[in-house]
Amino acid sequence: MADPKGFLTTGREVARTRPVEERVRDWNEVYVPGALLPVISKQAGRCMDCGIPFCHNGCPLGNLIPEWNDYAWRGDWRAASERLHATNNFPEFTGRLCPAPCESACVLGINQDPVTIKNVEVTIVDKAWEAGDVTPQPPERLSGKTVAVIGSGPAGLAAAQQLTRAGHTVAVYERADRIGGLLRYGIPEFKMEKRHINRRIEQMRAEGTKFRTEVEIGRDVDAAKLRGRYDAVVVAAGATTSRDLPVPGRELRGIHFAMEYLPVANKVQEGDYVAPTISAEGKHVVVIGGGDTGADCVGTAHRQGAASVTQLEIMPRPGEERSVGQPWPTFPMLYKVTSAHEEGGERVYSVSTTHFEGDEEGRVQWLHLVEVEFRDGKPEQKPGTERRIPAQLVTLAMGFTGTDRANGLVEQLGLELDARGNVARDESYATNVPGVFVAGDAGRGQSLIVWAIAEGRSAARAVDRYLTGASTLPAPIRPTDRALAV
């Protein structure tokens, strides 16, 4: 184990963010580089070698958390990296973007602050890159089998890397102009700089994975013909259909889905645009949706120079501590203040948008809302609470409803969907079409990055078995597995 008394003698410390007045002037990551290095070994030493490490249960990847905590405490960073990469293809992604359900399940968290697992994870992998310990792992021999992966988000990349390393010839198809999917254009630079994606792509290229950008399967290439060219296909196209808000005034200019707004800001950072085509500069911004995507819109609006930012959520404000209905080790829905919220803006809970109001030129100017209260699980408007707030830019960040059907991919392959609009699959990630598998949000629905990577790894094993009759690849989860909850 790590330090036998660490959890008794050392308090929890988390990564420190840069001052607000500094970071809102740039798009760099909000955390101070290397801020935890002097204390990270002691933080890893707080891991208490509990009899049953529930952090394993909280993490769908099955990360070997006590093991790499022990190595980090001892200063054996190469061994820590090896154990970390044994279960996770991209720990620098999860270490920056995952909400850390492993920490919610940490046994120490029953009566103390949990171990800073996420901070230890990202420190291990960053040090591994700096030391040159992250290298390509090309296969020893090729199988002669070919696989097409549709989509280059975390699920697609994980599946592609696992299958390439198993000896198959893999091509990843991405409809955008760069590889990365949601990681590339949906995650702001201040949460994860894209250099982390770029170096992983170079690693994968060196291993033999092929990438095809600006190719939309179903529109540019017939999906059925693609299936005929490859021995297997993995659909990892995500759940990209945004939930809309069909209220009067929705057609006004200045109202955008979050996934219209955020990619434009990211393209500016990539150097594609001098200035964003959708900008919050000098505007009163309203973000509808209280989740992480909404917070990303808030932080982006701050950096673009918004006059004001208001985030609306129809649900009541969550509590700050676990309730009896969210006991340990479940992943609780708690009130949290992200780095974007630290930077300013107002958060309003228990409200519903009734309609938008525009000017004579058809541009949105006001958002009308009303307070709601829930009865029998349904929101009911409270009479007399109607009001309007200025809104010159509105972003809709209310989640996603399923995989994209507009490009013809689903129909051309003849894929069946489940009741939630996701691609249906069996216990082996196989769809109703022989040789076609599905991984990530396309099959699971909107979820977390850690689940996407776990699905990509698990689907890769299923594909490997389909192609060769057996597989030594790991499969951390089944398609029906869900987060530990009540």
What is each model feature region?
Residues 23-43, 63-96, 100, 111-141, ...:
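Ferredoxin-type iron-sulfur electron-transfer modules in oxidoreductases and energy-metabolism complexes
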Residues 168-184, 309-319:
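Glycine-rich FAD pyrophosphate-binding loop
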Residues 294-299, 304, 439-473:
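A conserved FAD-binding loop/helix module that cradles the flavin
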